[in-house]
């Protein structure tokens, strides 16, 4: 099945089974805005809990904060967002479609990589176990030709972005013969800049109102509070501050479902270190964050680092953790060495000292910062993409199952009475009442037991319990496992011990120790 078709099925599945709804749907929706439904909000909360506990619970020197969305507008002047938070945009005159010039070029680079991979896949199929991929990539003329084109384009693109040379970006689009995905033509306008921040007015009347912004990132709320946290918490460098919160960007080209939205949620941690040690801490956090992702069990081959050649104005090192989505490897987390740019800028614009006094060296300095930043929505999407599975069963039927990590699944256990009579529903409710304080349970009595199993498979419930007539006699139930569909008979008294450890966030956190 084509990857594009797989992605469409995932999007449809999210709506059909209560994970993600188009926002304001009865009013025909609002472009690139989505609501998390009953199962989606549970999965999302579990993702956030996994991240939060991995940061704050497992590290004595990391604490949390929840800063306001509205902040003093000068903060965004200091951070560079007012002057430099822009996207390069280009219009196609025939389709009237507006695109990000950098994304068009990135997609072209990805096409060269796809051509290389197709050659590799064909050769692997032809040669079987004797296939040497490394040797093939080094010697095959078609692979080498596409690699040369990719590398040359990447180098030219990186320089144009670093210089923010808009004319060169357009010339690259022309030279690469990139066409509009709607009209199929190359009738492009010039590239121009567009600021991404949402602005609004704060105040009782237009005469005395203040222009404020919906924050485009959560990091600045940490920076302006870092000294308050350090002093009240008696923190010593190195230490970190974690935050989960909404951010807003006026993306002109929002696309790929919840991957790129105008309202999104971030999980960020800013780690404050002594100047000169930041490049020692950067690789440590780089590896720690990759371990966090891989603890989910999605396979190391589905992740890769993408080190930045073009660095943001505040960074001296940066990398992305990319995950293999149906539409290619895409960023799910960024790790940046932000230097002391942000804190120095806030000192300059506020006129107040926010230097840290180091009692060990008896000196004051502005700390450097290592940042880890995850988009919760992208993380959610990556998990759904990997979990969505279609299986052919022996009877010829197709089973759709979400193979979610048990600790992240919205519901951990479904309790199903075989029939809706003879005391079986009451016994099922009794089991739920004994377990609901430990993990999320659901009750379902409608349709055949087979159909109920399929419904639970589709929402990723790792365990199902069937209550039957034998349950009333010997207090045993049939426990079914989602991924294997295997069943075993266990005592009701054993359920908590069998299930709890496997569905707790602690089961993931222990992999990080």
Residue ranges of model-derived segments:
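NTP/phosphate- and nucleic-acid-binding module
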Residues: 1-513
């Amino acid at each position: 099945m084509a990857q594009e078709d797989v992605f469409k099925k995932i999007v449809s599945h999210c709506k059909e089974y209560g994970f993600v709804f188009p926002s304001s749907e009865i009013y025909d929706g609002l472009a690139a805005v989505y609501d998390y439904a009953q199962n989606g909000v549970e999965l999302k909360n579990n993702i956030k809990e996994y991240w939060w506990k991995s940061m704050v619970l497992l590290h004595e020197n990391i604490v949390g904060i929840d800063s306001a969305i509205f902040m003093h507008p000068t903060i965004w002047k200091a951070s560079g967002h007012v002057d430099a938070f822009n996207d390069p945009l280009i219009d196609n005159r025939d389709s009237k479609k507006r695109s990000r010039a950098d994304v068009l070029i990135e997609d072209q680079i990805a096409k060269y990589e796809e051509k290389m991979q197709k050659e590799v896949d064909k050769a692997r199929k032809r040669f079987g176990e004797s296939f040497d991929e490394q040797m093939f990539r080094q010697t095959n003329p078609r692979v080498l030709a596409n690699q040369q084109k990719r590398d040359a384009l990447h180098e030219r693109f990186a320089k144009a972005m670093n210089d923010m040379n808009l004319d060169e970006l357009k010339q690259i689009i022309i030279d690469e013969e990139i066409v509009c995905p709607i009209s199929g033509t190359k009738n492009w306008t010039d590239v121009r800049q567009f600021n991404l921040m949402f602005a609004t007015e704060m105040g009782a009347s237009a005469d005395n109102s203040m222009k404020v912004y919906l924050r485009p990132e959560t990091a600045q709320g940490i920076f302006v509070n870092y000294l308050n946290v350090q002093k009240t918490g008696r923190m010593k460098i190195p230490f970190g501050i974690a935050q989960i919160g909404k951010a807003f960007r006026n993306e002109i080209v929002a696309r790929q479902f919840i991957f790129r939205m105008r309202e999104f949620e971030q999980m960020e941690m800013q780690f404050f270190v002594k100047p000169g040690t930041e490049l020692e801490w950067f690789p440590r956090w780089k590896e720690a964050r990759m371990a966090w992702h891989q603890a989910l069990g999605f396979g190391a081959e589905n992740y890769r680092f993408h080190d930045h050649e073009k660095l943001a104005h505040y960074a001296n090192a940066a990398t992305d953790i990319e995950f293999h989505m149906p539409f290619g490897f895409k960023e799910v987390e960024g790790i940046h060495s932000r230097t002391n740019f942000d804190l120095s800028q806030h000192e300059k614009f506020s006129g107040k000292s926010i230097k840290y006094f180091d009692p060990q060296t008896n000196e004051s300095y502005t700390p450097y910062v290592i940042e880890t930043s995850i988009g919760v929505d992208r993380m959610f999407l990556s998990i759904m993409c990997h979990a969505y599975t279609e299986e052919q069963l022996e009877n010829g039927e197709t089973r759709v199952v979400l193979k979610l990590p048990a600790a992240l699944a919205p519901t951990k256990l479904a309790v199903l009475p075989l029939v809706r009579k003879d005391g079986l529903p009451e016994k099922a409710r009794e089991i739920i009442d004994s377990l609901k304080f430990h993990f999320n349970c659901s009750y379902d009595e409608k349709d055949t037991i087979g159909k109920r199993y399929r419904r639970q498979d589709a929402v990723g419930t790792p365990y199902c319990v069937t209550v039957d007539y034998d349950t009333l006699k010997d207090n045993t139930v049939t426990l079914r496992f989602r991924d294997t569909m295997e069943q075993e008979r266990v005592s009701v008294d054993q359920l908590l011990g069998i299930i709890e450890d496997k569905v707790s966030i602690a089961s993931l956190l222990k992999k990080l120790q």
